[in-house]
Amino acid sequence: MSPSRALSPLSRALLLACLGGPVLVSAGSACAAEIRTDARQYYRLPAEPLEQALNHLGRQAGVLIAFSPEQTAARRSQALDGEYTLEEALAALLAGSGLEARARGDGAYTLEALPVEDPANLQALTVVGDWLADASAADVFEHPGARDVVRREQFQAQGAASTREVLERIPGVSAPLNNGTGSHDLALNFGIRGLNPRLASRSTVLMDGIPVPFAPYGQPQLSLAPVSIGNMDAVDVVRGGGAVRYGPQNVGGIVNFVTRAIPEDFATKLDVHSELSPSSSQDGLKTTHNVLIGGTGANGLGGALLYSGTRGGDWREHSDTRIDDLILKGRFQPSDEHAFSAMTQYYDGEADMPGGLSAAAYRDDPYQSTRPYDKFWGRRTLASASYEYTPNASQKLNVTGFFTKTLRSGYLDQGRNLTLSPREYWVRGLETRFSQGFELGESRHEVGIGHRYVNEASHELRYWTRADSGQLPSTGSRNDRDTRGSTEANAFYIDDRIDIGNWTITPGIRYEKIDSEQKNLLKNSKDSGRYNASLPALNAIYHLTPSWNLYANTEGSFGTVQYSQMGKAVQSGDIEPEKARTWELGSRYDDGILRAELGAFLINFDNQYESNQQTDSVTARGKTRHKGIEAAIAYDLADLDPLLSGFDVYASYAYVDASIREDGPNKGNQVPFSSKHKGTLGANYRTGAWSYNLDGSFQTSQYADNANTESESVDGSTGRIAGWMVWSARGTYDFGPQLNDLKLGLGVKNLFDRRYYTRSFDDNNKGLYVGQPRTLYVQASVGF
């Protein structure tokens, strides 16, 4: 690999136009130019996350230290207690991190990666094993496809109170307002690259590698998404280059929620986030509390308790929400070779659903609710255990078992009837992965093989009463649905990561074999099917420099035949899964000052099924094509002029052309709920203990139906959805270690109170849904 060359300010400015992530700058209150870096000073800093340590050192020394969150993520510093020069203190904090501090003049410093030897000259061969891993900056940079990781510090800086708000800001991802039967905070709606966002059914969604959907094969939807952003350290979105390792619903990529890590030293961390929308129907604060308690002993045994709880409603009437999410994690590493880990989760919540509004009701009061009966509740229990064996640097074995039990239920006004729909799901899984590294001539290989077995069972019921009776149904009411589903699925993969010169090439294939059935106990009938999918892939990276690479990939991906779609597939006489072929080409640059990425993609998606909740039917949309460009950039302006120290800017943009390609009246139309243009832009400023953030996001218009209906219907379910742009602002103060790292923040979302909306088209509670109005929020966090 060729040596790294520092780019001039002019070169970086040119790259700004075409190729992203925020840069943090720790700054002291004194003028940096007046600081003597060779003078010895007493420093006392605890062992803590590297980002916090650099912030505290910068404040004590009165210097500027610029770095990106990715550089410090998942890294800790040793404690300092004594007299050091600034150079010595920086070296001590960065020991073992793979980073070094470079003086840039006027007392300012930036962090840069230590030089990496040419792979051909490396003596040690180290396997990666799990591609998702801890989503470190190095993992992301070396990934052969589009991938973004949003870390806890970033979504706190954005004022994000939900997973939807975090996902909505990632290039190529659309996470619309809660709507339809997912119009509550327990659900999650998002789509990647123009795929329908309804209940996130087109992507593989994981939490620490464990499937999040209550039935990942038979019902891969997130009407109950047991993931609280307060319990997460990062959100890892792999839009391309991951379908060989992860599935099944991988047409829309892989999203992995990374839970908060077990601290190395015993720690207690508390934080709170409260919101209020004064101009809406909200009658009180909506508040989320988060807690982490845990640590690791000298014997390698560690544990942590995570809790996130939400109470309150949002800007719509009839939106009260209660969520309790408790996670217990444990890890025992008696030696470098052996590591054991386990996790349990209990998630329980309930929420009123405000529902959609007709056009007339929306004009009268967009914050009202006309559906007093709609309500959703659910709970999930998860248990997982994992064993990792690493006998040497070139071998790694991981075995993970998991079990989930889920209940999701709710009342829904379906016009003539009020319904109660309790549904239970049980999932058992066992996954084994093995990686072996070896050398062959001038090339280095890491061969990975894996197998996952999943067994699912479901029981879905629906009870009803007449709507004009005004009585809610119970389990003693008449029922019109009683089905039991089951699935056995085996997935196998093999790939070979080959490093030769500046190239990294990874061919691989995933094979899925699925046996699924659904029994209708009311009709005494059964629909069943056996099918399989072979998904070959080829990924490649070319390293121009240690800071700049090119990547390309092509991969097969697929979506399962869900329980609700099995009857339609059997009737057609051809039980085939949804299939897609994805192509990507892009470039990524990251030198610690400038982060930039530019990529293009093409997805040809065939044999799609589409469910309509209003008519309780399944139709075939058939073929769609998704093509576009994604770009992101972040830049530390101190690189242009020291007077701009503390400022960084960022932007992202996605152009997505998603069109229906199936022959018929809708051929050539835009896929519903996909915007052609979407992006973000903003700036951060840090001075001393103060931090300020200004952020904007925008998207262009969408359609709600396949016909691309322009005019608005009376019920509000169809018609063009207008584009919008909103701005947010935030300010925080860090009181430092003398007050247990107390941080206080105040922010406002939708700063200019822009009115925007979305629609629900094929749900029973269809109609118009108003967007979040101007909302004030406060944040506080403290650690012990």
Stretches with model-predicted labels:
Residues 282-311, 315-353, 375-388, 441, ...:
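Transmembrane beta-barrel wall of Gram-negative outer-membrane proteins
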Residues 210-239:
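Short acidic/polar hinge/loop motifs at secondary-structure boundaries
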Residues 333-347, 377-521:
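Face-selective signature of the C-terminal outer-membrane beta-barrel domain
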Residues 54, 112-156, 164, 390:
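Short, acidic, small-residue-rich periplasmic hinge/interaction motif at the N-terminus
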Residues 112, 139, 144, 164, ...:
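Extracytoplasmic beta-strand/coil segments of soluble accessory domains associated
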Residues 294-296, 447, 552, 638, ...:
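Conserved C-terminal beta-signal and adjacent last beta-strands/turns
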Residues 291-293, 386-390, 396-412, 543, ...:
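Membrane-embedded beta-barrel scaffold of Gram-negative outer-membrane proteins
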Residues 434-436, 440-441, 447, 505, ...:
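Gram-negative outer-membrane beta-barrel transporters
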